[in-house]
């Protein structure tokens, strides 16, 4: 599933290539792709026609395009009040260029300059919906994103406030890193990478860690996601690509995730994998020892 760096790569591509364009046609090829838009495909299509993209936004793994009615010149328009929220799901792709002729095309939009944007989604977990913008903590976000906390790459991210929240949590630190209401954007891959860098096992209770160690984990999460962003994100297959259809290559630089049975790059111990929340956690048993189970 795309995490923060992968979504940010897509956002940057869209921001550079679709901002300022007006939508002249929309076709929904699969109803599941608009199931989150409660008014249905016809309403989504009708409302998007003639709207102009004024910008892009992201919080954590959530991506959106801000819109207006397209009637006023760009310089005289008020701030947007509605957004097209894009859920990439497990395999969603926002592709620029000619509309592809393939079975997994879900939505296609044409612009006033003759270019097109296609939403391709093999597993159909993603989709589009229109939502109003609301102001939360000084930032305009779509209503479905209002509950999501700021992510470590957000300029207004308050690391100390998040550390304070984590210190009060009687649950595993990895579980808290994946909680989008505590801190957003850190998915399974980058949680494992941050914990490996901090030499902390994900099964440790958040409340058992010191404030400096929690701050270190958050700093590592930010650093590893910046590193991934610089390499176009992490792609294990062809499902994650940027707006030009190109895969990222940070998977070659991963220190923990997916490295079960391989030597730890730091100490040489054999990396292990544990089941966790219907996912897998990868860690070094020497650098990141599991917490001891207290006997009653």
UniProtKB/Swiss-Prot annotation:
Active site residues according to the UniProt entry: 2-3, 61, 279
Catalytic activity of the protein: Hydrolysis of DNA containing ring-opened 7-methylguanine residues, releasing 2,6-diamino-4-hydroxy-5-(N-methyl)formamidopyrimidine; 2'-deoxyribonucleotide-(2'-deoxyribose 5'-phosphate)-2'-deoxyribonucleotide-DNA = a 3'-end 2'-deoxyribonucleotide-(2,3-dehydro-2,3-deoxyribose 5'-phosphate)-DNA + a 5'-end 5'-phospho-2'-deoxyribonucleoside-DNA + H(+)
One Pfam family this sequence matches: Fapy_DNA_glyco
EC number(s) given by UniProt: 3.2.2.23, 4.2.99.18
Cofactor binding note of this UniProt entry: Binds 1 zinc ion per subunit.
Binding site for DNA: 104, 123, 169
Family to which this protein belongs: Belongs to the FPG family.
Matches recorded under NCBIfam families: fpg, PRK01103.1
Function noted in UniProt: Involved in base excision repair of DNA damaged by oxidation or by mutagenic agents. Acts as a DNA glycosylase that recognizes and removes damaged bases. Has a preference for oxidized purines, such as 7,8-dihydro-8-oxoguanine (8-oxoG). Has AP (apurinic/apyrimidinic) lyase activity and introduces nicks in the DNA strand. Cleaves the DNA backbone by beta-delta elimination to generate a single-strand break at the site of the removed base with both 3'- and 5'-phosphates.
Descriptive protein name: Formamidopyrimidine-DNA glycosylase
Organism: Mycobacterium sp. (strain KMS)
Gene this protein is translated from: mutM
């Amino acid at each position: 599933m795309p995490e923060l760096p992968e979504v940010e790569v897509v956002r940057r591509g869209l921001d550079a290539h679709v901002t300022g364009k007006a939508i002249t046609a929309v076709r929904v090829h699969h109803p599941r792709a608009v199931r989150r838009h409660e008014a249905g495909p016809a309403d989504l299509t009708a409302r998007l026609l003639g709207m102009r993209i004024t910008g892009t936004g992201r919080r954590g793994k959530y991506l959106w395009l801000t819109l207006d009615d397209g009637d006023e010149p760009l310089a005289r328009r008020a701030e947007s009040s509605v957004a097209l929220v894009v859920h990439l799901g497990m395999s969603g792709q926002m592709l620029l260029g000619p509309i592809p002729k393939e079975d997994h095309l879900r939505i296609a939009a044409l612009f006033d300059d003759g270019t097109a944007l296609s939403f391709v989604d093999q597993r159909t977990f993603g989709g589009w919906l229109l939502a109003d913008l609301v102001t939360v903590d000084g930032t305009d976000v779509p209503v479905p994103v209002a509950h999501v906390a700021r992510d470590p790459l957000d300029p207004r991210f308050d690391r100390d406030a998040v550390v304070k929240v984590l210190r009060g949590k009687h649950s595993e630190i990895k579980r808290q890193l994946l909680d989008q209401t505590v801190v957003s954007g850190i998915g399974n891959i980058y949680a494992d990478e941050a914990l490996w860098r901090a030499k902390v096992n994900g099964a440790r209770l958040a409340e058992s860690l010191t404030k400096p160690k929690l701050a270190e984990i958050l700093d590592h999460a930010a650093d590893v996601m910046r590193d991934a962003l610089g390499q176009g994100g992490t792609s294990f297959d062809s499902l994650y690509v940027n707006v030009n259809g190109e895969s990222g290559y940070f998977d070659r630089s991963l220190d923990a995730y997916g490295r079960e049975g391989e030597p730890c790059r730091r100490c040489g111990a054999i990396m292990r994998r544990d089941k966790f929340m219907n996912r897998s956690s990868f860690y070094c048993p020497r650098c990141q020892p599991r917490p001891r189970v207290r006997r009653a």
